[in-house]
A protein has these predicted regions:
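Outer-membrane beta-barrel proteins and related beta-barrel translocases across Gram-negative bacteria
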Residues: 1-320
Length: 320
């Protein structure tokens, strides 16, 4: 800097930093290394691009000199004031040993992750959310990609996808539909609920107007209705997402209608009367055979497939 044409040792730092609001498209440089079982490798190399302002895509790949390879596709999306989420698809083809020698094996493993959340203000009457983590039970244990190392000790995979909606009016109806998944990566057992359906109708007074005065035994009669249906599946990792996993599905539905009323008796006593009706629909039932008294053998249980139904009733009353 010159002051009055006299040079001084003082200087001002200067730099140019271009700022952009757009995401840059380009190649992702891979990491290079060596694995004792699969030779030299390149990992996590690929390409990134953003087709629009609402989502982007990352494509990555791995390759090992023994022939093993892996692919990953990841995407993040967001629509302002509506929803946001991410999706990850991972696949690896792993080769162990050398072809023609003992110990040679070839294995495909995969993992799927999806998260989705809805802005609470986008639609107050309906909501959709998802948190999915499913795939091969041995994915995180056998994957040789460095990105999966933190999940090596993960023993469970859980997923849940739900949708709920409220139908306004009188009576209002709340409806929810949920699919869930729980997977033990050690025992390779998979438990699912595909789906669980719930519906609830608000309390109604059939013998009085909506905002009318409720007096007497008749006008105080009120009832509700609720429904719950579920389809449960227990299977193994080897049968997951195959048609055989539906062979032992257990499904059913329960209808419930509570009914009650209250009134004054002798001006000072309050009387409450109520009851409940339930009907259960089942896709299969269990028949218990009689106990064998002579041989002292407990009767066997037979599973009978096919639709069946039964009812339950109860009644209650109180004075206070």
């Amino acid at each position: 800097i010159y002051i009055a044409d006299v040079p001084t040792p003082i200087f001002l730092p200067f730099g140019y930093f271009p700022l952009t609001q757009n995401r840059a498209t380009g190649f992702i440089f891979p990491s290079v290394g060596q694995n004792n079982d699969r030779g030299y490798f390149i990992q996590n190399g690929g390409y990134y691009f953003a087709p629009s302002d609402f989502f982007d895509v990352t494509l990555l790949a791995d390759y090992y000199t023994n022939g093993s390879y892996g692919f990953r596709a990841e995407s993040k999306y967001k629509v302002r004031y509506k929803y946001t989420g991410s999706l990850s698809l991972r696949f690896e083809n792993l080769i162990n040993g050398e072809r023609g020698l003992p110990g040679y094996s070839k294995n495909n493993i995969y993992n799927i992750r999806w998260s989705h959340s809805q802005d609470s203000k986008s639609n107050p009457n309906s909501r959709f959310s998802a948190s999915v983590n499913l795939g091969s039970s041995n994915y995180f244990r056998e994957s040789v990609n460095q990105l999966n190392t933190p999940n090596f000790l993960n023993n469970t995979l859980n997923s849940s996808v739900s949708y709920s909606k409220t139908f306004r009016g009188y009576p209002s109806v709340n409806l929810s539909l949920t699919a869930s998944h729980s997977q033990n990566t050690r025992t390779q057992t998979v438990n699912m609920s595909l789906p669980t359906l719930q519906a609830n109708v608000e309390r109604i007074y059939p013998f009085v107007k909506r905002n009318g005065q409720k007096k007497g035994i008749l006008k105080n009669i009120n009832l509700q209705y609720s429904l719950r249906g579920e389809n449960r599946i227990q299977t193994s990792d080897s049968l997951f997402l195959k048609k055989e996993m539906f062979n032992d599905a257990r499904y059913g539905m329960k209808h419930s209608i509570p009914l009650s009323t209250n009134f004054k008796f002798l001006k000072h006593l309050s009387v409450s009367i109520g009851g409940r009706f339930e009907e259960i629909w089942a896709g299969q039932t269990i028949k218990r055979n009689d106990y064998d008294v002579i041989n002292q053998i407990q009767g066997k249980k037979d599973t009978i497939k096919g639709f069946d139904r039964f009812n339950k009733y109860n009644f209650n009353a109180s004075i206070g």
